[in-house]
Amino acid sequence: MNGIPMEHGLLLAAILFCIGLCGLLIRRNLLFILMSIEIMMNASALAFVVAGSRWAQADGQIMYILVISLAAAEASIGLALLLLLYRRYHTLNVDTVSEMRG
């Protein structure tokens, strides 16, 4: 058995990326923006793994490890900024914080 076809995996990655992009553009809450970025990064990691498995190369898995480590760094920095934003302004709305700046 070959497993799933490459087109199905790439279609799933594209759908996940579009969901993350819509969440990034529509939502104004910083927590949901961070979650949308994580969805987009996981979609790109899925595309790397699917493409790597199609040609039986380990490059896709190596890129997956890189994307996951970048996602972990982004999540830690993003959550630190989220805590700082909430402690200072008592809101997670990005538009409210940009208006408060003056």
UniProtKB/Swiss-Prot annotation:
Annotated catalysed reactions: a quinone + NADH + 5 H(+)(in) = a quinol + NAD(+) + 4 H(+)(out)
Keywords, sorted A to Z: Cell inner membrane, Cell membrane, Membrane, NAD, Quinone, Translocase, Transmembrane, Transmembrane helix, Transport, Ubiquinone
Organism: Aeromonas salmonicida (strain A449)
Gene3D superfamilies: 1.10.287.3510
GO MF assignments: NADH:ubiquinone reductase (non-electrogenic) activity; quinone binding
EC number(s) given by UniProt: 7.1.1.-
Membrane-spanning intervals of the chain: 6-26, 30-50, 65-85
PANTHER family listed in its UniProt record: NADH-UBIQUINONE OXIDOREDUCTASE CHAIN 4L, NADH-UBIQUINONE OXIDOREDUCTASE SUBUNIT ND4L
Any single GO CC term annotated in Swiss-Prot or TrEMBL for this entry: plasma membrane
Subunit structure: NDH-1 is composed of 14 different subunits. Subunits NuoA, H, J, K, L, M, N constitute the membrane sector of the complex.
Organism placement in taxonomy: Bacteria, Pseudomonadati, Pseudomonadota, Gammaproteobacteria, Aeromonadales
UniProt name for this protein: NADH-quinone oxidoreductase subunit K
Record localization: Cell inner membrane
Top-level taxon in the UniProt lineage: Bacteria
Biological role: NDH-1 shuttles electrons from NADH, via FMN and iron-sulfur (Fe-S) centers, to quinones in the respiratory chain. The immediate electron acceptor for the enzyme in this species is believed to be ubiquinone. Couples the redox reaction to proton translocation (for every two electrons transferred, four hydrogen ions are translocated across the cytoplasmic membrane), and thus conserves the redox energy in a proton gradient.
Keyword NAD annotated: yes
Key word NAD present: yes
Membrane topology of this protein: Multi-pass membrane protein
Gene Ontology biological process: ATP synthesis coupled electron transport
Pfam families linked to this entry: Oxidored_q2
Sequence similarity: Belongs to the complex I subunit 4L family.
